[in-house]
A protein has these predicted regions:
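Short, small-residue-biased leader/transition segments that mark boundaries at the very start
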Residues: 1-2
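Hydrophobic faces of well-ordered beta-strands that scaffold small-molecule active sites
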Residues: 6-9, 45-47, 69-71, 88-90, ...
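Glycine-rich phosphate-binding "P-loop"
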Residues: 10-29
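Active-site-proximal loop/turn and secondary-structure-junction residues that shape catalytic pockets
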Residues: 10-14, 51-53, 75, 94-96, ...
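Short, solvent-exposed loop/turn segments at secondary-structure boundaries
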Residues: 18-23, 102-103, 145-149
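Aromatic/hydrophobic pocket-lining residues that form the small-molecule binding cavity
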Residues: 25, 29, 112-115, 152
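Active-site-adjacent pocket scaffolds in enzyme catalytic domains
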Residues: 34-38, 42-129
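C-terminal domain-boundary segment and adjacent tail
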Residues: 69, 116-180
């Protein structure tokens, strides 16, 4: 089965979203949302600011545009509501970001072990029935390199074999949290 959802991540990753005035940010977010909706046929429900940046107004502006969650807050392994009505924070992890790990010289086998270690701890933490999110931040130009492919396959195989793992999308995580 193919899992996919479209997440807004800015116009480019080099235009950070800090320092915008409210009107300028609203215009930019509206343009980005329209472009994604036109290209995919589906309005995005989630947002991740370029470089995890936002202004004090970003969550409210996103809610006004129909977004339901952000991934800019890396402070928890579980979703939680923001102070803006209807908005959630869905977990994201900079620690499991392929760009950062491989950029710091980690090897393929080390990447596999890091993901396994993360899974094992989160699984233990979730033993009380309260799920945890293992977010893998992957970039095709990094993990997609031919010499890294077998390590990515190992990670996916390991996670797919875990009986308590739910391989899903951030849209589905947000929907599940809201339904609980």
């Amino acid at each position: 089965m193919l899992f996919r959802s479209w997440l807004a991540h800015g116009r480019t990753n080099s235009i950070l979203h800090n320092g915008f005035g409210v009107d300028e940010e609203r215009r930019l977010l509206t343009e980005i949302t329209a472009a994604i909706t036109e290209a995919t046929g589906r309005r995005p429900l989630g947002w991740m600011g370029p470089g995890l940046t936002e202004t004090h107004h970003t969550p409210e502006l996103l809610a006004d545009l129909g977004y339901r969650y952000v991934l800019d807050w890396t402070n928890d392994d579980q979703p939680y509501p923001l102070t803006v009505p209807g908005m959630l924070s869905v977990p994201y992890s900079v620690e499991l970001n392929d760009l950062l790990l491989f950029g710091k010289g980690f090897t393929g086998p080390e990447f596999v072990q890091i993901v396994i270690d993360q899974y094992e701890q989160l699984s233990a933490d979730a033993a009380n029935g309260s799920g945890r999110v293992l977010a893998l931040a992957l970039h095709p130009f990094v993990i997609g390199q031919a010499f890294r492919h077998k390590y990515f396959d190992q990670v996916l195989a390991y996670l797919a074999e875990r009986p308590d793992a739910w391989l899903t999308t951030s849209d589905d995580i947000a929907a599940h949290y809201r339904s609980a």
